[in-house]
Amino acid sequence: MAAYYLAVDIGASSGRHILGHMENGKMVLEEIYRFENGMVKKDGELCWEFDRLFKEVVNGLKKCKEIGKIPVSMGVDTWGVDFVLLDKDDKVLGNTVGYRDHRTEGMDKEVYKAISLKDLYARTGIQKADYNTIYQLMAVKKKHPEYLEQAETLLHVPDYFHFLLTGQKTCEYTEATTGQLVSPITKDWDYELIDMLGYPRKMFQKLIMPGTGIGHLSDKIREEVGFDLEVVAPATHDTGSAVLAVPANDDDFIYISSGTWSLMGIERKEADCSEKSCEMNFTNEGGYAGRFRYLKNIMGLWMIQSVRHEVNDAYSFAEICAMAEEAKDFPSRVDANDECFLSPDTVSYTHLRAHETDSYL
């Protein structure tokens, strides 16, 4: 009987459960469950629906039971930087705000009161992006200081789902590095930096590496899904898992991972935290086996995903692409990487405004 292994891959627009097993020396992958994802407005903030998403994770496990393919182990990967803060009773503090929310506006300047951008990059090797965990935490500190006072635990999104599955609190390395608070030298939290910024040390769990066993399903989840398995931390940052899957047999390769974001880069054995790299805004995200994903963040499918949502998902992605191909006379060129497209009210309106002002043509 085949041994099955379950990957739960949750992106910014959808999630999927994929079962894998070996057959005649080859890995066979089977998607068994899929669900929608996206941010919703709550109290004026763009938030993730983590309660609903976790129900979908559990529903996918129930699907395994239904089809008679019980996995030996599983792990969850997601996008980077976002997190929850838990109080002493493990309750989420505040809204589950997502990285496209505007709460981080101006927070870079607050961080730079404690450390310059140049010195911050030299310490972490992570790109300047206003949505990084370091700036999100500064927004919490400035706008809801009571949350930091009450917080006992910080968990990034995949770590939070692993906690809900097992009851065990962990922080996986590749995901943690995206937040700009981890040292590429020690491969641990930069506690000196954390102290400089006034973030409570006690929130930050010990980092674990990909491949670390976290634990078995809790009694509650085991009873609900009808079986038990081991939860093992993958490279929980989705790009980390994608790069690990690149079919390259040597170190000399370039990868492009495309989803809501597109990431283009290489693998390195050491981080490049030079001033030149800082000026180019390249990032050194943690990878498997202590390597670094030296890459550039590029706008991916977010714009077409947003256009689809603006028309209430009336068309499939294939239909939207077909309509775009039919509109051959399209005179403008748009800089899709411009920050105005990070979280506009509507992508189509932003493009029209840009076209009128010639700002991005």
Label for each model-derived stretch:
Residues 101-113:
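Short alpha-helix plus adjacent loop in nuclease-associated cores
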Residues 191, 197-210:
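A conserved helix-loop-beta module that forms one wall/lid of the active-site cleft
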Residues 97-104, 260-262:
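Short, acidic/turn-prone active-site loops that include or flank metal/cofactor-
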Residues 1-94, 122, 222-231, 359:
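N-terminal glycine/serine-rich phosphate-binding loop of ATP-dependent small-molecule kinases
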Residues 66-99, 127-133, 162-183, 206-209:
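Short beta-strand-loop/turn "lid" adjacent to the catalytic site in phosphate-handling enzymes
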Residues 60-72, 144-148, 194-198:
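Phosphate/pyrophosphate-binding loops at sites that engage ATP/ADP/AMP, CoA/4′-phosphopantetheine
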Residues 209-217, 262:
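Glycine-rich phosphate-binding loops at beta-strand->alpha-helix junctions
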Residues 6-7, 19, 112-125, 135-168, ...:
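Active-site core segments that coordinate phosphate-bearing ligands/cofactors
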